[in-house]
Design a protein with these regions (language model features):
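Intrinsically disordered, low-complexity polar regions and short flexible loop motifs
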Residues: 53
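Positively charged n-region of N-terminal signal peptides that target proteins for export
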Residues: 1-5
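Beta-strand-rich domains and repeat architectures in extracellular enzymes and scaffolds
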Residues: 57-58
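Bacterial N-terminal signal peptides
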Residues: 7-17
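SH3-family beta-barrel domains
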Residues: 22-50, 61-65, 72-75, 82-87, ...
Length: 167
């Protein structure tokens, strides 16, 4: 009896120690905001550096205001970001905005009056268009661009997580 209790305790201890915990949302060390998270480029241009300081070389320059970016790390006033092509580097936080935007991935993507493909198509957007993100349901997001507002199928957008819901 003692051996079976000892064996049970040993097994439970091993399970507790070696099974990874359920993934909790990681938080940024500087902002305590979720990592990863989406932001947008606040300015017309933004230097993308190899490391988190002005001493690091500029690898390239983002040249599109409101472009959605994904923050994957934080260090001081710097945010490590990636774009839709998974290219990235370190950008100073002052160049970023919490305003949510998305990039249209599918060419001539229909924008519907409601989150229903049988409703009126209000516009067709070309791949690469940047739109403001409004609301999201499980499969749809409401977006706006150049005076048009409507619903797009979420899988055709970059800048929003597949399971993200927004009111």
């Amino acid at each position: 009896m003692r051996n079976s209790i000892f064996g049970l305790i040993l097994t439970l201890t091993a399970l507790i120690l070696f099974i990874p915990p359920l993934q909790a949302s990681e938080r940024g060390s500087q902002t305590n905001l979720p990592i990863p998270r989406f932001v947008s480029l606040r300015t017309d241009t933004g230097n993308v550096r190899r490391g988190p300081s002005l001493n690091h070389r500029i690898d390239w320059v983002f040249k599109r205001r409101n472009m959605p970016l994904k923050v994957i790390d934080e260090y001081g006033h710097w945010r490590r970001v990636t774009d839709r092509d998974n290219e990235g580097g370190w950008v100073h936080h002052s160049l970023l905005s919490g305003t949510r935007t998305v990039i249209i991935q599918d060419d001539l993507m229909p924008i519907y009056a409601r989150a229903d493909p049988s409703t009126l198509v209000k516009a067709h957007l070309q791949a690469g268009v940047v739109a403001r993100l409004r609301k999201c349901t499980r499969d749809w997001c409401q977006i706006s661009v150049d005076g048009y507002r409507g619903w797009a199928i979420k899988t055709g957008l970059w800048g929003v997580e597949a399971d993200e819901l927004r009111d």
